[in-house]
Design a protein with these regions (language model features):
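Acyl-donor (CoA/ACP) binding surface of acyl/acetyltransferases
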Residues: 2-58, 73, 86-206
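Active-site rim helix/loop that mediates acceptor-substrate recognition in acyltransferases
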Residues: 64-83
Length: 206
């Protein structure tokens, strides 16, 4: 779905709530995961993940439930206003919400990002790579992106490994907009052409 323009389409939606785009049927699947747009009922699991310090360390730090609600509503709102945002990650075998990942590009961001955050008890299973592969495919094919980045703290070695498995390389230090302006990040990334050239060599499950 193409992003909504700032004129015409949005004003029509506000005057006609039934015109709001629906993403209820959007699902990306792998053999082990379902990726779908976030929902209000994801709040409990989202909040639990963000209360875990090792998980939250590089994604804004530990957040109380009230701030998690704001973050979740921002993600849901971005889907409706821009036509994309991160997906909720559902583990097929349990039906459980285990994280969020996918496309993200707030105002002032240094590029179109594919990001990931997986609950700590699901680390080491290859879920971040598996989900990021299909989210990257979708971003290139559906959103028409020509490149992707991953903003990664230099100390975040696990996320660096994920980026390498996706075929991305370290492009050097980057700068994020407020409220992350003081965060240290390296920008990892690759072009759409590079992605498609390597796509058949990427792992599906780890």
């Amino acid at each position: 779905m193409a992003p909504l323009s700032a004129t015409g389409s949005l004003s029509n939606m506000w005057s006609n709530p039934t015109a709001m785009p629906s993403f209820d049927d959007l699902r990306l699947e792998t053999s082990r995961l379902i990726l779908r747009p976030p929902r209000v009922e994801d709040l409990d699991a989202w909040s639990e993940m963000m209360l875990d310090e090792p998980t939250a360390r590089f994604i804004g730090g530990v957040m109380p439930r009230a701030l998690c609600w704001r973050a979740l509503m921002t993600m849901i709102g971005a889907w409706h206003a821009a036509g994309f945002a991160m997906f909720s990650v559902i583990e097929k075998k349990s039906g459980r919400w285990i994280g969020r990942l996918g496309p993200w590009q707030p105002e002032g961001w240094p590029g179109p990002e594919i990001g990931w955050a997986i609950a700590r008890d699901c680390w080491g299973k290859g879920y971040a790579v598996e989900g990021a592969i299909v989210a990257t495919d979708w971003s290139f094919d559906t959103l028409g992106w020509s490149s992707v980045i991953h903003s990664i703290n230099p100390a975040n070695v696990p996320s660096q490994r994920v980026a390498r498995k996706l075929g991305s390389r370290n492009l050097g230090p980057g700068k994020l907009p407020p409220p992350f302006a003081n965060d240290l990040v390296d920008l990892w990334g690759q072009s759409r052409d590079e992605w498609r050239e390597r796509r058949g060599q990427l792992p599906i499950e780890q």
